[in-house]
From Swiss-Prot:
The species this protein was found in: Methylobacterium sp. (strain 4-46)
Enzyme class: ligase
Protein name: tRNA(Ile)-lysidine synthase
Reaction catalysis annotation: cytidine(34) in tRNA(Ile2) + L-lysine + ATP = lysidine(34) in tRNA(Ile2) + AMP + diphosphate + H(+)
Family of the protein in this entry: Belongs to the tRNA(Ile)-lysidine synthase family.
InterPro entries: Rossmann-like_a/b/a_fold, TilS/TtcA_N, tRNA_Ile_lys_synt, tRNA_Ile_lys_synt_N
Gene encoding the protein: tilS
A Pfam family annotated for this UniProt entry: ATP_bind_3
Keyword Membrane among UniProt keywords: no
Length: 344
């Protein structure tokens, strides 16, 4: 049996889950996100076998997108009961969008999980994302034209609404979790949507073996993501360090002002991050950031040349109005557009 398809042994599972679930783990306990697929089923089974542990609550989100989803959620509940773990089914209610369905389902899933974790007083949510998920995410974002932040992929751990979101299996091939379920006799479901050609992730999944044959393996894609996460951390620190020296005269409520010459003197990557962060600060609460291509075109194609030439500039970008004049770049929320009434 190859290492890529070897089941997790109890010691390895304990090393991965111990920091989260062990006696010194998250205060208040942990919520496990378990869909019923092999990855999350392995997470649940391994967690149940780990003594001593903090309180563990298993949660299954029923998105209501497939007729069999309710039955699958009930199957997770039954297995959780046999393993001695409490279980809750969370239902995504309301009308489902016609576009960006997977994106909307993901947002709803995390909202429901976060709500349950807060209700239970849990300190963290664990998901069973794998090396395969990481590789597919990096490839999808590469196809979408993402920059370093997007290509950094899925973080092993991050903050989510004041809690921790952890992914203890992120560097494991999916085949190992499938093998773990098979060895333990834990039943799991297979979502047919994972192979549906209408979804970009499923289409890319089909070509992954061809890419791997050329050397672009899931492990190498995941390694690229790890390297870019390190670079992103350094870039964020550089932008944070530069920000105080860029503060221009007070800009007024709800506005930001940057010293134009100071912005132009920064390394391009740092200047781009400073601009992106400034726009994001004006758009607090909005989930979707401005596309990197537009930021690059605005900064490198218009703003920096105008600073060098000493000419004023006015443009809108990402919901912000940018006004370059008097040696400073003023950023303000873009005013709402007026609708003109048609005559007659």
């Amino acid at each position: 049996m190859s290492d890529a398809a070897r089941p997790l042994d109890p010691d390895e599972a304990a090393r991965r889950l111990g920091p989260w679930l062990g006696a010194g783990g998250q205060a208040g306990g942990v919520v496990l996100a378990v869909s019923g697929g092999p990855d999350s089923t392995a997470l649940m089974g391994c967690a149940a076998a780990l003594p001593p542990r903090v309180p563990v609550l298993v949660a299954t989100v029923d998105h209501g997108l497939r007729p069999e989803s309710g039955e699958e959620a009930a199957g997770v509940a039954a297995l959780a009961g046999r393993l001695g773990l409490p279980h809750r089914i969370l239902t995504w209610r309301g009308e489902k969008p016609r576009t960006r369905l997977q994106e909307a389902a993901r947002a709803a899933r995390y909202d429901l999980l976060l709500g349950l974790a807060r209700e239970a007083g849990a300190g963290a949510i664990l998901t069973a994302h794998t090396l395969d998920d990481q590789a597919e995410t990096v490839l999808m974002r590469l196809c979408a034209g993402s920059g370093p932040a997007g290509l950094a992929g899925i973080a092993p751990a991050r903050r989510l609404g004041g809690l921790l979101l952890g992914r203890p299996f992120l560097d494991l091939p999916k085949a190992r979790l499938v093998a773990t379920c098979a060895a333990a006799g834990w039943p799991f479901a297979v979502d047919p949507g994972n192979a549906a050609a209408r979804f970009a992730r499923a289409r890319l999944r089909r070509v992954m073996p061809l890419l791997a044959a050329e050397g672009l393996t899931p492990a190498r894609l995941a390694r690229l993501a790890a390297r870019l996460r390190r670079n992103e951390a350094a870039l964020a620190a550089a932008a944070e360090a530069a920000r105080p020296s860029l503060a221009a005269a007070p800009a007024g409520p709800g506005r930001l002002a940057l010293d134009a010459a100071g912005l132009a003197a920064l390394p391009e990557a740092v200047a781009l991050r400073v601009l992106a962060d400034a726009i994001a600060a004006l758009r607090a609460g909005e989930r979707r950031p401005e596309r990197l291509e537009r930021l690059e075109e605005a900064l490198f194609g218009r703003i920096l040349p105008a600073i060098a030439a000493g000419t004023p500039l006015r443009l809108t970008l990402g919901g912000a109005l940018l006004d370059l004049a008097g040696g400073r770049l003023l950023l303000a929320p873009e005013p709402p557009r007026r609708r003109t009434k048609r005559a007659g």
